[in-house]
Amino acid sequence: MTQLGAILIPTGNIADLDRERSRRSLGPDVRPDSKKKRNYLLTPAYRTTSLLEILGYTETQLAAYLEHIRWGGLGLGVQACPKCGSIDRHYRCASINGWKCKGCAKQFSVLSGTRVHGMKMSLKTFMSFAMHFMEAKDSMSSRELSGLHDLDYQTAHVLTLKVREAIRETMGSEGPLTGYVQADAAYFMKYVRPGNVGTGAALAAKEIQKNAGLDEDGKLPAKVNESMHALVVFVQAGQQCHRRYRIAMIKTENQVDLLTLGQQFCAKEAILVTDQHSAYNFFSGEFVAHHQVNHNKEFQTRDGVNTNLAENIFSRIRAAVHGAWHRMSVQNLVEYGWEVAWRQEMVGSDNL
């Protein structure tokens, strides 16, 4: 039996099933008068595009849809040649579902000059891939995306990396953070898998090895994973859709790296909020104001000062690790952080 076949097994009398269905809640969309504040992601306003709608489009319609996204600001039917930059109503070239430049005579498509230039998959597969990636709650693994779209795992993995790189480039190119800015850091990939505990001679050898490694206080030195790095998050506070993020990776929390990142990401007029880690001490003389929260005593001061927006990113990253990725690499740690920041920034925007 297939996995889908289990859903189609008869479970009882149809009349009983209809009565059970009538007793069920019909969801939040049928209660518009409810005074309880609803998550924007649950409202019809969020669902501007659906996967079923995308799958119903032809390749030509999808090309026109992407053309509007890329060149819509230039005018109706106007394209910009990726080769020479000529902006015109170029000759239509049906053989490649694209255009031929009036200036340099080069052929190009809507994906030419982008990160997916020369992509072999169809636009329908590409749009479905993008829709699944965007609609995932925390994230979606490359293996799952490869299975849904009949792609080689490496193809799906590389495409997700290209998407994350585009997110980092787009969000990171904005101006410096201003106003009320929260900053925090958290360590990832710090787990060290314990070795197998043997018996007899193997256990005795392990005890000798442990005793030989005791420090001055007779304690075992802490095991540290060589891959462990700190992810630093700067968040410009504000309403949903108006928060801005900056993500960076450092080996450890230290004054030199954190001050450099603060100067790089934040305007001097910003008001910084951090915890009481000594690495943030130099922020006081660099920015207009610097508030600190003593996390040993409280998560938020009586004045409402906290770093919850920055810490929320770390919570979502850990949720994505457990629920989707299962592992991360140092090479792509920053991209994973940018993806989560992008998902958080898009809360309050439509889905496509």
Each language-model region and where it sits:
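Residue-level recognition of single "structural anchor" positions
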Residues: 2-352
